[in-house]
Amino acid sequence: MDDLEKKEHLPMTDRAEENKQAEGHLQKKLKELDKESNTAEYSGLWAKLIAVICICFSLFQIYTGFFGALDAMIQRCIHLSFGISLVYLLCPTKRSWVKDGNVHPVDLALAVIATIPPIYILLNYHQLILRAGTVTPADAFMGVLGIVMVIEAARRIVGLPIVIVVLAFLAYGFFGRYMPGPLAHRGLTINQMVGHLFFTTEGVFGIPMGVSSTFIFLFILFGAYLEKTGLGKFFIDIANALAGWASGGPAKVAVISSALQGTISGSSVANVVGSGSFTIPMMKKLGYHKNFAGAVEAAASTGGQLMPPIMGAAAFLMAEFVNIPYMEVVKAAIVPAVLYFIGVFLGVHFEAKKDNLQGTPRSELPPWGKIMKEEGHLAIPLVAIIGLLASGYTPMKAALAGIIVSIATAMLRANTRMTFNDVVDGLIKGARGALGVLIACASAGMIIGIVTKTGVGLKLASTLVDLASGNFLLLLFCTMLTSLILGMGVPTTANYVITSTIAAPALLQLGVPILAAHMFVFYFGIIADITPPVALAAYAGSAISGGDPLKTGVNASKLGIAAFIIPYVFVLSPQILGIDASLTSIVITTCTALIGMTGVSAGMIGYMADKTNLLERLLLLAGGLLLIDPRLATDAVGIGILAFVLFLQLMRKKKNAKNI
């Protein structure tokens, strides 16, 4: 009898206690794997003080969302002041310093000091405008202090890799005159760097911070309220009703529920822990190996950052960088995201057929009608925000409306109704949930500042083109590797900023449409979460399943193989993103990509209509990959190869059935 079966036979009180312990274990694992979740918990006066700061932070963002953002520099300074002070309070210098629920004096002092530089800008705003370009000694001191405090905040809540990358760019800015060849520049003085990075909207307070202080925060707050309503449970219940009974049902439930959860969340690790605590034990119970069970949830949850309407934070940056409305990014992302989840679903289906894994008996599944009656109203805010974005409302207004609608719709039934404390708790959770992205955006702004001040972006782009000798596919491969390597330690936001300023221009030089180039680096930055050896989402999945993290990551990469193919598809065939495309071209490109993914997925798993031998696996992979190329000849050959393998398997299966 395994652990899950033992648990089912426990008395109710013991089972409740075990569930509580399991929840505590999962939260501990989440904090180990996701620095944004690894915050200290205080009690008494300090807990109340931090809650008040969080509430004021959220109310400020709601106010400016309703009545319009303040001047760019003022809005971003206030945003940073709130955020950075909370980081120093919630992410202590040493965990051992958090005693008796009190903030250590050192962390309190740092929290106060960190707010001084942005407040200095607020108090001297007009004087700074009048003496633009001139940096006084006081300015220099405050600028250096502000940069140092942002970097230390990044170390605390984002991680050491982003700090290393930022310091490398700062060093390049200062020591540029000593760099070899085309990378050399005349070098920047301390005053030049400080003036550009801290007292303009080109560095810390640049585009990433602007997006964080307007769109991203409100969408995170919207997600916090959707979570409070219980929408995540509704998604799992709906997925169970749709696919729980099918072959490999629990795994398909994980894919569908994670796809739905991805519409409101942008964190791979948090998604794994949230839905995986339910789906992974169910998969193990019905026969999935623990490594594969963790991999299914990791691959599905990582895809959540690709699923509109609320994608990863980098998607909002993409809209600004490409200079298009956010809704255009959403529209472009729909078909690739659906293809990704179909690819994961196919992998799960083939694995279930290969190992003859059954679904959950229908008698154990929640009735569809009952789910919709009791919880269906929870989807109204999601429908509302999609409708508002499609109608041309700004992301700020749409997110604000979504927050109001989510609270209002929760009141429609007693089982989902929010109390005043729930509403306040949503404000607190929203503010805390935005801190990691906020600091990542501030750090990414410094990277952009150095790139724009030194011109290194175009130099590196030209170098990439030269290294690839103008070979288009080789350049795409190099760009993919860059995004994956950065994504192993740098959060998606900073990863996207770096690759979009360095690698994306190289793709543009070879004629790739700007949206396709940016979407290409965006995708691979996210897929790093399931790419070994780091693969944070896979580590989270293995922590729940009890599997091996590396093997879980390998399985997750196999399941998520679609994500490695789709970016090549939309660079070679931009029609799939809706770029200069007719409905016919979109349908044809989507269908060929889907057939190709089916072949590759079957080849990776080792099953199509029957278990494959080595030759059939190689043919399936080759046929699927040929369909990436949009030319008619390669499509015809690819489809022919896949049809041939399918025919062989059907004949063999028929022959084996007769012999039984």
Residue ranges and their predicted role:
Residues 1-133, 140-144:
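Conserved, well-structured core domains of diverse proteins
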Residues 7-47, 331-433, 536-625, 653-660:
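Long, contiguous bundles of hydrophobic transmembrane helices that form the permeation core
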Residues 223-227, 258-267, 299-305, 445-448, ...:
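Transmembrane alpha-helix interface/packing and boundary motifs in multi-pass membrane proteins
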